[in-house]
């Protein structure tokens, strides 16, 4: 099993219900493709280090997953890239010797 950490930033002007639905949707994408969510953190609204698409703040989310292959992370990245509500994301494969 491989462990990945996914961090993504949601635009700050999204409504609370839409933001919660977005998080559930992307967690569902991960689990539907065979990933197991180990940990999920909502860091809340934070200031960005630099402006992204004219936004100075964003809602930060961190998800750690276990998966056999990269299908779940590939699908997450594909859909996050075309989603206007996610302004930045990164997927990191954690070292196996931890």
Swiss-Prot record:
Task: Please list the GO terms describing molecular function.
Answer: small ribosomal subunit rRNA binding; structural constituent of ribosome
* Entry keyword set: Ribonucleoprotein, Ribosomal protein, RNA-binding, rRNA-binding
Q: Which GO terms describe its cellular component?
A: cytoplasm; ribonucleoprotein complex; ribosome
Q: Which domain of life is it from?
A: Bacteria
GO terms of biological process kind: translation
The family database entries (InterPro entries) matched by this protein are listed as: Ribosomal_bS6, Ribosomal_bS6_sf, Ribosomal_S6_plastid/chlpt, Transl_elong_EF1B/ribsomal_bS6
| Family, per entry | Belongs to the bacterial ribosomal protein bS6 family.
- What's this chain's function? Binds together with bS18 to 16S ribosomal RNA.
The entry's protein name is Small ribosomal subunit protein bS6
UniProt source species: Staphylococcus carnosus (strain TM300)
Q: What is the taxonomic lineage of the source species?
A: Bacteria, Bacillati, Bacillota, Bacilli, Bacillales
Q: State the gene name recorded for this protein.
A: rpsF
